[in-house]
């Protein structure tokens, strides 16, 4: 499952490796790009939905790269639960979470959730093994070219 798939770059890679891919994004532009890009690939299914509305089917891999932090905070924990329930034992979850020092978290704390190491442990380590964690705290451009102060936790987890 490619969550918040955008232009479908992760989906394209997974398809090239033989995966069946369910991808969703709330953006009309993403829908247009992906339905055109993968129109001839029967292993690709696109859903024009948000994290809040998506019904996660059973999956061996769920990727939410640079997308999960756009989930409405009031639905965030239920979305994590639905993701967890969709994965079998040994399934992989790849997520990026904002840290507490991220510019968006500081400016709009009701819209974005910032996570500490303890928050991440509390959220995931009961049901997952942590395979990879990289913390990034640097100024990088957004797609529009504006510089943003990013504080990210990039995680790869395997379900127990």
What are these regions (language model features)?
Residues 3:
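Conserved beta-strand/loop positions that form the S-adenosyl-L-methionine
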Residues 6-55, 74-78, 92-160:
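Class I (Rossmann-like) S-adenosyl-L-methionine-dependent methyltransferase catalytic domain
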Residues 56-57, 87:
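Intrinsic-disorder/low-complexity coil detector
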Residues 60:
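Conserved acidic residues
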Residues 63:
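A conserved beta-strand element that flanks and buttresses the S-adenosyl-L-methionine
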Residues 66-67:
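Short catalytic micro-motifs in class I SAM-dependent methyltransferases
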Residues 70:
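ABC ATPase nucleotide-binding domain "signature" loop
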Residues 77-89:
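A short glycine-rich, Lys/Arg-flanked "PGG" loop and its adjoining helix->strand segment in the class I
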């Amino acid at each position: 499952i490619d969550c918040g798939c955008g232009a479908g770059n992760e989906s394209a890679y997974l398809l090239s490796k033989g995966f069946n891919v369910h991808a969703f994004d709330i953006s009309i532009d993403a829908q247009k790009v992906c339905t055109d890009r993968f129109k001839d690939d029967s292993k690709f299914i696109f859903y024009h939905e948000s994290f809040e509305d998506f019904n996660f089917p059973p999956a061996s891999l769920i990727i939410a790269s640079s997308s999960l932090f756009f989930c409405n905070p009031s639905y965030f924990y239920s979305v994590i639960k639905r993701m967890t329930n969709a994965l079998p034992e040994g399934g992989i979850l790849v997520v990026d979470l904002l840290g507490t020092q991220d510019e968006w978290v500081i400016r709009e704390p009701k819209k974005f959730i910032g996570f500490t190491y303890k928050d991440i442990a509390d959220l995931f380590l009961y049901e997952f093994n942590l395979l990879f964690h990289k913390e990034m705290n640097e100024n990088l451009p957004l797609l529009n070219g504006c510089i943003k102060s990013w504080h990210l936790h990039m995680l790869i987890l395997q379900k127990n």
